[in-house]
């Protein structure tokens, strides 16, 4: 007779899925998170395909089966792509996928107009049209990769967010300042950008005017935003997965800077959310249609009563910083729980999707 533990393990095994991680590993911006996700997924017994967007394509066979074709990987998990020295185009074994058992994580798509390759998003749309669960949808990526669109969503859904105005042309700085109606210093941002890149500190109208003209000279189609500066010692990143908060860290402002990105040198700490911070973070993730997001906010002075200032939602959150922070925070409730269970936040994300009710479409239920 089988034990209860055996039955439980079999029930979990029945829910295991295939995981396709589509991403772009830029040599100037190495992608460590996709390796982390792959390793944690394989430890759970999931079948994983790590596919570089460059060179990847998908097609159906005559009998209706769909496969993903991608370049192979070396022993370190790096993609083996054709080059001037190695012109041989060698694809790995085709990877069969089906909406009923395959979860697709799309990372690094960028915006169709500014970064990435439009065909990458088009490929993800094919998967969406056929009922696959794609984390995250192309619509979610389009919103999250555009800071202005983020801001419009926040305003429409009645979130607390810093006052923000878009500068529409090279001579638009003075008009935008009048619309913003905020004191210097201000924050200037390009609508596309991540990891704190494209975010600048502005102390005068003269400096703003000069910088706006310079940016438009470099790119006549650039979207520039100015935003009121909210004084703070730190901001908060919350990982929200399918309507559930799995972790939160506070990122102190970098010494001698005004940014708090881990990539800019901030050393994160575990953050205990208030009820209003937690509920508003879940609402922000839902507002952009995200299944797995990083929600960024600046805390209110009265954290227990007032809504935080939401900055943006990230549709491809890096997990390295929060992984290391939580693993080193065994004294805190969440860190202690993860350590006792021998798990991690990435593992918890992957385990959450064992529940097919969280998948998109009837085939995933």
Protein language model regions, located:
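Proteolytic processing junctions in secreted/extracellular precursors
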Residues: 2-14
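C-terminal active-site "lid" helix and adjoining low-complexity regulatory extension at the edge
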Residues: 4, 272, 286, 290, ...
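Structural motif
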Residues: 18, 102-103, 309
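Active-site nucleotide/adenylate-binding loops and adjacent lid/helix of ATP-dependent enzymes
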Residues: 19-24, 34, 124, 129-130, ...
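Conserved N-proximal alpha/beta basic substrate-recognition cap immediately N-terminal to
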Residues: 26-163
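Short glycine-rich anion-binding loops that position phosphate/pyrophosphate groups of nucleotides
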Residues: 109-111, 191-193, 316
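Protein kinase-like catalytic core scaffold
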Residues: 186, 247, 293, 309-312
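Phosphate-binding site of ATP-dependent enzymes
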Residues: 197-284, 288
């Amino acid at each position: 007779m089988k034990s209860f533990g055996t039955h439980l393990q079999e029930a979990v095994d029945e829910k295991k899925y295939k995981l396709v991680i589509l991403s772009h590993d830029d040599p100037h911006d190495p992608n460590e998170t996709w390796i982390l996700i792959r390793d944690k997924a394989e430890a759970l017994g999931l079948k994983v395909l790590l596919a570089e967007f460059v060179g990847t394509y998908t097609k159906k066979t005559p009998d209706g089966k769909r496969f993903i074709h991608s370049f192979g990987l070396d022993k370190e998990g790096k993609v083996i792509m054709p080059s001037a020295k190695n012109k041989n185009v060698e694809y790995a074994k085709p990877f069969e996928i089906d909406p009923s058992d395959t979860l697709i994580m799309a990372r690094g798509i960028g915006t169709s107009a500014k970064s990435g390759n439009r065909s990458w998003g088009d490929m993800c749309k094919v998967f969406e049209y056929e009922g696959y669960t794609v984390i995250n949808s192309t619509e979610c990526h389009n919103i999250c990769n555009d800071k202005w669109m983020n801001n419009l969503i926040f305003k429409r859904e009645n979130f607390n967010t810093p006052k923000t105005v878009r500068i529409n042309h090279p001579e638009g700085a003075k008009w935008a300042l009048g619309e913003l109606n905020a004191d210097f210093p201000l924050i200037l941002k390009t609508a596309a950008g991540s990891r704190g890149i494209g975010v600048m500190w502005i102390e005068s109208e003269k400096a703003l005017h000069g910088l706006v003209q310079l940016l438009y000279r470099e790119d006549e189609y650039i979207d520039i935003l100015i935003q009121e500066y909210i004084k703070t010692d730190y901001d908060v990143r919350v990982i929200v997965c399918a309507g559930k908060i799995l972790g939160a860290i506070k990122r102190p402002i970098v010494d001698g800077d005004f940014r708090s990105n881990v990539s800019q040198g901030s050393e994160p700490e575990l953050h205990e959310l208030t009820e209003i911070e937690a509920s508003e973070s879940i609402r922000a993730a839902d507002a952009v249609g995200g299944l797995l997001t990083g929600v960024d906010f600046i805390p209110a002075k009265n954290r227990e009563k007032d809504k935080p200032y939401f900055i943006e939602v990230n549709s491809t959150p890096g997990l390295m910083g929060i992984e290391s922070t939580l693993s080193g925070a065994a004294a805190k409730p969440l860190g202690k729980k993860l350590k006792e269970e021998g798990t991690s936040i990435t593992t918890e994300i992957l385990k959450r999707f064992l529940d097919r009710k969280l998948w998109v479409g009837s085939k995933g239920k």
